């Protein structure tokens, strides 16, 4: 599956637009990791526990978006974007979305 954040796929012609596709996940760290992250936020620096959590969430959201596109018969996704939001304390949602297309 070709995925790009641009409106076209270099070297390919879009022959059909299949519409919006998306994938999302909500992730939270367990209490031990959350305590460590809180302590690290006091002294400054990267909060590696959350960096890892969001990286895993983005990858899962991409997989789910790709599955949605395959279900619609697409072989590419253009205009890929991410959205992140806090849905509750210590939990974040990551959504990947884009436009499913067929390219040749």
From Swiss-Prot:
<dbReference type="Pfam" id="PF01906">
    <property type="entry name" value="YbjQ_1"/>
</dbReference>
<dbReference type="InterPro" id="IPR035439">
    <property type="entry name" value="UPF0145_dom_sf"/>
</dbReference>
<comment type="similarity">
    <text>Belongs to the UPF0145 family.</text>
</comment>
<dbReference type="InterPro" id="IPR002765">
    <property type="entry name" value="UPF0145_YbjQ-like"/>
</dbReference>
<protein>
    <recommendedName>
        <fullName>UPF0145 protein DehaBAV1_1363</fullName>
    </recommendedName>
</protein>
């Amino acid at each position: 599956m070709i995925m790009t954040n641009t409106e076209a796929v270099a070297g390919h012609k879009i022959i059909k637009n299949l519409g919006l596709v998306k994938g999302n996940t909500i992730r939270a760290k367990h209490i031990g990791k959350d305590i460590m992250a809180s302590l690290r936020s006091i002294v400054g620096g990267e909060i590696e526990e959350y960096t890892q959590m969001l990286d895993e969430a983005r990858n899962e959201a991409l997989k789910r978006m790709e599955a949605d596109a395959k279900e619609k018969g697409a072989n590419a996704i253009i205009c890929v974007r991410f959205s992140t939001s806090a849905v509750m304390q210590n939990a974040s949602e990551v959504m990947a979305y884009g436009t499913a297309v067929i390219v040749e």
